């Protein structure tokens, strides 16, 4: 009877050990599953993090490129502003120069017209401005005791012989030929000035008032 009880106790211990081993294996299996699941989740997290890092890297690259582009645009706009201001200053200087030149021209023209009026009165000569510069046309009045003598003339401006002959004739009538010639010369200058093309000076023609630049493509 004692031997049977001893075997039962041994069997119980073996059975207990076996059951414990079963439980340990079951726990080990669960732990392995949890570890596998954890590793799987960790791998997913790493892959997600890697994708996120790649996106962040791309975004940082884009931000850097945009920042560099913005810097180029700011520099470009700075140069452009300086150029526009320089052009404005040149334009103002050119306008002032043209204004001064016009004032001088008008002053000179007034002086010439006044001189022409004086010479015309002194020599008694009227010169037809409309015929100039192609022809020298007009009339000289020679005062007389009873009546004035009219000396009309209508010559080609290049007819030197005819003009010399006319001057000799006027000189014989006591007309101051030097003043008469000066009158014709000044009238010729006025006629040539009136018929000259009113083109702006070369500097004004080259002056820039409007700049068309593609602001979407700044220079590097």
From Swiss-Prot:
Alphabetically list the UniProt keywords: Cell cycle, Cell division, Centromere, Chromosome, Coiled coil, Kinetochore, Meiosis, Mitosis, Nucleus
What is this protein identified as?
A: Kinetochore protein Spc25
**GO BP terms, alphabetized:** cell division; meiotic metaphase chromosome alignment; meiotic spindle organization; mitotic metaphase chromosome alignment
User: What does this protein's UniProt record list under function?
Assistant: Acts as a component of the essential kinetochore-associated Ndc80 complex, which is required for chromosome segregation and spindle checkpoint activity during meiosis and mitosis. Required for kinetochore integrity and the organization of stable microtubule binding sites in the outer plate of the kinetochore. Participates in SAC signaling that responds specifically to disruptions in spindle microtubule dynamics. The NDC80 complex synergistically enhances the affinity of the SKA1 complex for microtubules and may allow the NDC80 complex to track depolymerizing microtubules.
Q: Where in the cell is it found?
A: Nucleus; Chromosome, Centromere, Kinetochore
An example GO CC term for this entry is: nucleus
Please give the family membership noted in the entry: Belongs to the SPC25 family.
Per the database entry, which stretches of residues form a coiled coil?
79-114
What subunit structure does UniProt give? Component of the Ndc80 complex, which is composed of Ndc80, Nuf2 and Spc25.
């Amino acid at each position: 009877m004692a031997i049977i009880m001893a075997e039962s106790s041994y069997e119980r211990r073996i059975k207990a050990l076996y059951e414990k081993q079963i439980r340990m294996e079951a726990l080990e299996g669960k732990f392995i599953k949890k570890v596998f699941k954890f590793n799987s989740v960790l791998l997913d997290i790493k892959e997600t993090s890697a994708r996120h890092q790649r996106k962040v890297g791309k975004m940082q690259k884009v931000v850097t490129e945009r920042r560099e582009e913005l810097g180029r645009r700011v520099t470009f706009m700075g140069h452009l502003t300086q150029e526009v201001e320089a052009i404005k200053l040149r334009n103002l200087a050119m306008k002032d120069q043209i204004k001064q030149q016009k004032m001088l021209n008008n002053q000179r023209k007034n002086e010439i017209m006044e001189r022409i009026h004086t010479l015309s009165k002194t020599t008694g000569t009227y010169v037809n401005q409309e015929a100039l510069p192609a022809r020298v046309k007009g009339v000289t009045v020679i005062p007389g005791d009873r009546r004035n003598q009219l000396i009309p003339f209508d010559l080609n401006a290049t007819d030197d012989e005819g003009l010399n002959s006319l001057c000799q004739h006027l000189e014989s009538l006591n007309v101051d030929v030097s003043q008469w010639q000066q009158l014709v010369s000044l009238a010729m200058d006025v006629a040539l000035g009136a018929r000259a093309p009113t083109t702006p000076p070369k500097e004004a023609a080259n002056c820039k008032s409007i700049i068309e630049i593609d602001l979407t493509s700044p220079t590097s």
